[in-house]
């Protein structure tokens, strides 16, 4: 499908700009169409190079290493799948160049995959809009090893991204809104010490998991994680229903 067809069919363009003029919109391929990730998304604004998904990527693994080319491709493919859901739900997406603490993705390595780096251990997580993912999560071997070590039967790149973006949207939708009291009624008080909560969760003395109260065992560790796990599963359900509908 070429840009003229997109315009003729009246498809909605997802641009990082808040508004798009009423005149004819000319699409062009994302600049990463010609990179190793082969991004197939289009861009509506002629002044922008990258699609709304690629524009949120801040750091990628060193592409001089052949393994990292596939890692980056798989990470971005999962991120585009995430963004389709976010866009369909009309959730706000502003990247790190558009506002302070805007959405940014850092796909990082550590010494386990690149001995020349100073970072010994990269943990997947979120902080003030920045979502960090260990690039090795794109490796099947590493993924299965972590499944065994962490006791996680369901562990995917997309699952990580759904979970971490839940923390990001908590900051936007809940933290400074009238919804905070309702959040605490349902999930608990997020002001309890996060470090101590996780230390207790990973200790031998953690309480027995109660499946009638939490959607996953990790959700029981802290209200923030309860929210993020619930959010991730909601996005998973939405995607599953869309798949079912597509099959009629």
Question: What annotation goes with each model-predicted range?
Answer:
Residues 1-8, 159-160, 167:
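Long, charged N-terminal interaction/targeting segments
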Residues 5-14, 20-68, 84, 130-143, ...:
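Metalloprotease/metallohydrolase-associated module, dominated by Zn2+-dependent proteases
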Residues 28-31, 66-140, 151:
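Auxiliary, metal-adjacent structural segments of Zn-dependent hydrolase domains
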Residues 74, 78, 154, 158, ...:
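Hydrophobic (often cysteine-bearing) scaffold residues that line and stabilize catalytic clefts
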Residues 87-91, 169-179, 232-240:
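Hydrophobic/aromatic-lined pockets within catalytic cores
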Residues 141-161:
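Short pre-active-site segment immediately N-terminal to the catalytic Zn-binding motif
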Residues 155-175, 228:
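Active-site recognition of the HExxH zinc-binding catalytic motif
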Residues 155-158, 181-187:
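Alpha-helical scaffolds flanking conserved acidic
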């Amino acid at each position: 499908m070429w840009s003229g067809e997109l315009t003729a069919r009246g498809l909605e363009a997802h641009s990082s700009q808040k508004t798009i003029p009423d005149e004819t919109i000319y699409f062009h391929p994302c600049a990463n169409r010609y990179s190793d990730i082969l991004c197939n998304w289009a861009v509506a604004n002629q002044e922008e190079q990258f699609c709304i998904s690629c524009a949120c990527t801040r750091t990628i693994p060193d592409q001089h290493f052949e393994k990292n080319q596939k890692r980056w491709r798989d990470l971005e493919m999962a991120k585009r799948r995430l963004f389709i859901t976010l866009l369909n739900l009309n959730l706000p997406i502003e990247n790190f160049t558009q506002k302070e603490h805007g959405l940014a993705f850092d796909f990082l390595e550590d010494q386990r995959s690149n001995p020349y780096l100073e970072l010994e251990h990269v943990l997947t997580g979120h902080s003030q809009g920045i979502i960090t993912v260990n690039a090795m999560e794109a490796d099947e071997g590493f993924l299965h090893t972590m499944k065994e070590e962490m006791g996680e039967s369901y562990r995917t790149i997309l699952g990580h991204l759904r979970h971490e973006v839940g923390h990001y949207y908590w900051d936007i939708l809940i933290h400074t809104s009238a919804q905070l009291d309702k959040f605490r009624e349902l999930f608990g008080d997020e002001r309890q010490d996060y470090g101590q909560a996780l230390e207790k969760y990973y200790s031998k003395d953690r309480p027995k998991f109660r499946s009638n109260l939490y959607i996953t065992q990790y959700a029981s560790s802290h209200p923030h994680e309860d929210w993020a796990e619930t959010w991730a599963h909601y996005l998973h359900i939405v995607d599953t229903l869309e798949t079912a509908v597509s099959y009629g």
